[in-house]
Amino acid sequence: YLNYIKNIADNGGNYIRIWLSEYGIGLLDTNGRAVDSDYNSTDAAYLDAVFRYAEERGVYIQLVPLFHGMFSSVGADTAWVSCSFNAVNKYGYLQTPTEFWVNERAKSEIKNYFRYIVARYGYSNSLLSVELCNEILSSEGITETVADEWCREISDYIREIDDNRNLITVSSASSQTDLIYSDCFDYINIHRYSDSLERFFSDINTGNDCNKPLLISEAGYSYSEPVVNTAVVHTQNWAAYMGGSVGGAMSWYWPEIEALTDQNGANPIYRDMRYLTDFSRKIGKTGLPRTTITQSNLYDYDTKSNAVGFCCGANAYLWLYDKDAINGNSDIHIKSDIMVSMPDGDYQIVVYDTYTGNKLSANEKTAANGWISFSVNNWSKDVVIEI
């Protein structure tokens, strides 16, 4: 984790997501209890070090204390056999995973677990949020009603004890559920695996209708295999940020990303991240809110490409992309005609290469009758446009 934080921060990134589980850092031991004296002190101390280093590097952590596999006895992610609440283990008392969400003793003990997390890590400026449970609705036998009741009870408890008012969220494997949009959460947490960028935009638009911040905190080309390359991560990151998420899309396949090198021995994903983080910081420095440009106010007349973007102050920012770029394919677009709604006046249209950060062109244009029209010539893959 320290190496991940270093590489992310060195290239301008500022947030990560960490599960507390048997796969990495875990506070709940199989043969322990959900009480202060039984939490894994070695892993807790390591997490202390992770938070200290994150604070030094300006990186924020979305902390996930529970995950669905802990409460599933079947499936690829099952971890019920090692769950401390399982009756087969030393202090366990639940016969089935489904009981966890409604058993009063289990709820009392898990509140103690969250109290411990708040007490030990809630002070940190690097704690972005507490995600109550990863993909909670993938837990065995749980219903959305039960999940909603449990989340409300636990989030209410955390808010009672957390003087630092850390953000609270939850995640689901599907964005087509009311739970993740619940008013008991501070922001919307989306997981999206797809070879279609349009699904990213659909998720974001649904979230924006709730008038809450939205973060794509788990993403990939496929949930069943690690399809990891620059084209996939690049397009999903830019699609998330330019489409209206508060940041880029957080790839699930970070170990595979970490292992990538180019012919010069550098990591192409980290290098590519730099151009998006530089661009986003430029906008962030304005201190002004972003307003998504709706499709009724933006037209791309090139049938093989699409554009999304937002306004910030008097400026607009568009991401123009080839519809097949996520698959590593792209035509050379000789001329793409764009029209976007803007207040009347004179503007400079600046086009940047998102893979290098280089300025490709700059032209003066005038908006009249509430619209500005311009062309982007001889481009491929994707470009970002500043108006």
Each predicted region: which residue ranges?
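Active-site mouth of glycoside hydrolases
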Residues: 1-186, 190-199, 210
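Catalytic-core region of carbohydrate-active enzymes that cleave or remodel glycosidic bonds
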Residues: 53, 59, 182-258
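Residue-level signal for short, function-critical loop segments
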Residues: 67, 136, 220, 322-324
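Short, surface-exposed tryptophan/glycine-enriched loops
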Residues: 121, 375-379
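Residue-level structural signal for beta-strand termini and adjacent loop
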Residues: 133, 364-365
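Active-site flanking residues adjacent to catalytic metal/cofactor-binding acidic residues
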Residues: 134, 217, 385
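Aromatic- and carboxylate-lined catalytic core of secreted/periplasmic carbohydrate-active enzymes
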Residues: 222-224, 233-363, 378-387
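Short strand-edge motifs at loop-to-beta-strand transitions and within beta-strands
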Residues: 370-372
